[in-house]
C-alpha cells in the first residue's frame, strides 16, 4: 500500500468501529465521528484483555466478534436508558452547514499534517533504530505471530527467557495488527501508517471538539463554527503534538492525548444526556487502555471543569451531577482493575525510569505557560500561538 492510501485505510480502521458504536448510542454523526477513535480503542481494550486471559487469539475475526458483542450490549443499554434521553437538548446540536464549516477546518488541519508526513517520512515502510520504534513494531509482529494482544501479557515478548509478567498498554498495537491483517502490510508499515493516521486525525478533530465545547455556550452557532474550524486548522501548527511526539516514537502516548479531549467532552455531556453514560465509560476505558497518561489528562480536565464551571452551574443539582459522573467513573475503574493492578506490580520498575529535570518550580511554571517541554529544546517557542491561546482564554 502507498502512504496516502494506506493512511486512508488506517483512518477507516481507527474511526469506523467506534462511529458504529456511537451511532447505536444515538449520538449525531458529527459527534459520533469525533468520538469514534476513543470508542474504537475502548472496544479493542474490552476484547484483548479477556481474549488474552482465555487464550483466544486476536485477529480480524475476533476483533469483529468483539465489535458485534459491544454493539449488542450498547443496543440493550440504549433501550434501558431511552427514558433518560433529553430530546430538547439534542435539538440544539450543530446544524448542517455549520457542521460542514467545522469539517472543512478539520480536513484542512489533517491535510497539513499529512503533507508534513509525506514530505518528512522518506523511508516510511521501515522504522528508525530507536528502542521505542523497534519495540512498537515488534509488538505488532508478536500479535500477528502469536495472537496474544493483552496488555497484561507483554512479558511474553519483553522477557523472552522468563516470561515474567509485564503490563504494557497494547491497544494501539492491536489496532495496527488488525490493519496489517486487512491489508497484508508488514508490521513496520502497519505501525507507521497507524501512527500517521492517529497524528493526522486526532489533533484537528480534538481541537475542534474542545473549541466547540468552549465557544458554543457563549456564542452563536455560526461564530462558534468559524472559530472551531480555525482552531482545527491551526492545530497543525503546534510542534509538540503530533510532530515531536511522533519523532520520539511515543505513539501510544500520542494516541491517548489525541482521544483525551473528545472523551472529556463526552463525559461532561452526560450531565444532560444521561443515556450517553455507557458510551462515556467505553471511551474512558479506551483512553486509559491506550496509555495511562491520556486518562490522567482527562481527569485533570474534568477536575478543572468541575471546579471552575460545573460546581457553580449544576445541570440537575450538584448531588445528581456527582452521581452521574460516578456512574461513569465506577464502571470504568472496575473494567480497568486488571490493568491498574499490573501497573502497581511494576511500581519499582517505573520508578527506576525516572527522569529528573533539575529545574526549579519557577522554571517549571514558565515552561508550562509557554507550552514547552524538554523534547522541544531544539525548537523555538511558538510565541504567536501562545499569545493567541491566552488572548482566547482572556476573552472567554
Residues covered by each model-derived region:
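Membrane-interface alpha helices of multi-pass inner-membrane proteins
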Residues: 266, 277-292
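Membrane-embedded, hydrophobic transmembrane alpha-helices
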Residues: 1-99
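Membrane-interface helix-loop-helix junctions at transmembrane boundaries of multi-pass membrane enzymes
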Residues: 95-96, 218-224, 312-325, 393-396
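Hydrophobic transmembrane alpha-helices of multi-pass, membrane-embedded glycosylation machinery
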Residues: 286, 298-312
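Membrane-interface transmembrane helices that cradle and orient dolichyl/undecaprenyl
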Residues: 260-278
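Alpha-helical transmembrane segments at the extracellular/periplasmic loop-to-helix junctions
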Residues: 4-14, 256-257, 357-396
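Active-site lumenal/periplasmic loops and adjacent helix-entry segments of GT-C-fold
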Residues: 108-258
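Hydrophobic alpha-helical membrane-interfacial segments at the cytosolic entry of transmembrane helices
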Residues: 99-108, 282-284, 302, 315-341
